[in-house]
Amino acid sequence: MSETPSTPPVPAGPEPGPVSRWLNQQGFEHQLLDPDHLGVEVIGVESMFLQVIVAALKADGFDYLQCQGGYDEGPGQQLVCFYHLVAMAEMVAKMGVGDSSSEAAKVREVRLKVFLSREDIPSLPSIYGLFRGADWQERETFDMFGINFEGHPHPKRLLMPEDWKGWPLRKDYVQPDFYEMQDAY
């Protein structure tokens, strides 16, 4: 009895979720990424399209910016900015109806990611005009990773002193040997 050699299955890419399908119907280009560990849809967008896509998602019911942040993929790799949007008004409306079924209780949420080169000064448009809650979150991301948010009304450090050199959460950050302490106010 001879067995025919089997070829290993080719791993399929992520399946487009409801938000990705909606963005495709609206004509928005985006990159489909693997969902997170909770099954939340994750979508990659180009920095120049960020404001337009966020505005479209807000018009489609994603009315709450749950969080915005950044991370460093490692030395020589990209910096990533992420935005987690939730359809909060829909969730509250479902709670008011009293429908406790698992499908009705499911919150519509999506995470957008923007991948940035660490060369020069990484920048992308601020979404402060769409979500006021982005104010301190974008400032913290600037402060820790050096990502500039164009159009932000308060583009200054949030946690570190204004004269601090470097971006402390970048993986290529070199910690200074000496800190000059200033007097308490």
From Swiss-Prot:
Its main location: membrane. Gene3D superfamilies: NADH:ubiquinone oxidoreductase, 30kDa subunit. One of its GO terms (biological process) is photosynthesis, light reaction. The keyword NAD applies. InterPro entries: NADH_DH_suC, NADH_quin_OxRdtase_su_C/D-like, NADH_UbQ_OxRdtase_30kDa_su, NADH_UbQ_OxRdtase_CS. It is found in: Cellular thylakoid membrane. GO terms for molecular function: NADH dehydrogenase (ubiquinone) activity; quinone binding. It is a peripheral membrane protein. GO terms for cellular component: plasma membrane-derived thylakoid membrane. Belongs to the complex I 30 kDa subunit family. This is NAD(P)H-quinone oxidoreductase subunit J. It comes from Prochlorococcus marinus (strain MIT 9313). The gene is ndhJ.
